[in-house]
């Protein structure tokens, strides 16, 4: 076997292993966090930093933000209940599981139950969104910002964008539980 052939076989095996890790089996018992790794978050941040022309609608940088704030975000109340409170409610979870299974088996199925649960939560309960770091960085670059004072720092998207653009950033937020995520 040639050296090049061995290398491609090894590469294929690595890719297959990565794919297996991404499409892990999910049974629907624990809350379906995205579980972004530190490596993925750093890679996403570096990708954002290296972009020269950004589309404000791009999702580049979202993993860097979600890495620090996703576990706190699910405890934020929307219409009186947080996503975690809804998840712990057996009646609400049963309805969600049924909806997720319909998504999983339906015509728009991705073949991944984990993603079906995430989609079901977003469609049935709510999504707690934040500004896209790519959009913030686009505006910072467009208006040649050198300093940013953010009175509603929120989930940290604008902070991540400022870091990616090497811009001085001061963020103020009344929610002290967000500090570890920053």
Task: Outline where the language-model segments fall.
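Conserved S-adenosyl-L-methionine
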Residues: 136-182
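N-terminal accessory regions of S-adenosyl-L-methionine
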Residues: 1, 18-129
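Generic hydrophobic/packing signal
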Residues: 2, 55-57, 67, 145-146, ...
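A short mid-domain helix/strand-loop element embedded in enzyme catalytic domains
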Residues: 113-138, 152-161
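Long, low-complexity Q/N-rich tracts
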Residues: 3-21
